Amino acid sequence: MKNFIDLTEDLDLHKLVQEAQALKKEPCVHEALGKRKVLGLLFFNPSLRTRLSTQKAAKLLGMEVMVMNFSSEAWAIEYEDGTVMSGLRSEHIREAAQVVSQYCDIVAIRAFASLTDQEKDESEIVLRSFQKYASVPIVNMESATAHPLQAVADAITLKEHWPSHKPKIVLSWAPHPKALPHAVANSFVKMMASQEADFVITHPKGYELDEKITKG
């Protein structure tokens, strides 16, 4: 698996959880694995837990970490081909992704949905464009439609607290000061598809997830 964009059917989640649990017991066992390697963290949106945990994971693997906040520290990027670069966007994704690839061995990206254009959000233009033009592996630290790192962390938590009987797990919504995309919920649903549990989604009317995610 070169890229980690979303939870896919070919991902052995149970094996991944087992490896993660082993690393929790011996966090420095692979500290030479990332020696002389650089992880680039590109943030188009704020982050607390994902940023700190990803940086900590890289350090435990012996990697160096470079962080860039694109919202305040970089030129605005143009993602459309054939666009005349005479407006507010000074950098094209073709060149930007190649530059980042020269300095980083792995690139992790956080880019939320705009919540203004559903079709454009679902196209995952930021993540998919970097995946297309970068020459190094891409990791999703939360995008418009998915948060696979969070889903893996949730799977680890469930494993650690799993009862002896088949549990009932409920996914529901809670109030938040800001409108949020479905990324976390989408990935949680995909993660639960591989769990032996009575899984229920409950929510106010009008706040449904995409049927393409929940139909399974």
Question: Predicted segments — roles?
Answer:
Residues 12-15, 129, 212:
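Exposed alpha-helical structural elements
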Residues 11, 72, 145, 176, ...:
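Residue-level detector of flexible, active-site-proximal loop/helix-junction positions
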Residues 34-40, 48-159:
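Phosphate/diphosphate ligand-binding glycine-rich loop within oxidoreductases
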Residues 21-25, 155-159, 189:
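Generic structural signal for well-ordered alpha-helical scaffold segments
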Residues 19-20, 45, 110-112, 141-143, ...:
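Fold-independent oxyanion-binding glycine-rich loops
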Residues 44-66, 159-216:
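Glycine-rich phosphate/diphosphate-binding loop of Rossmann-like nucleotide-binding domains
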Residues 1-52, 56:
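Positively charged, low-complexity intrinsically disordered leader regions
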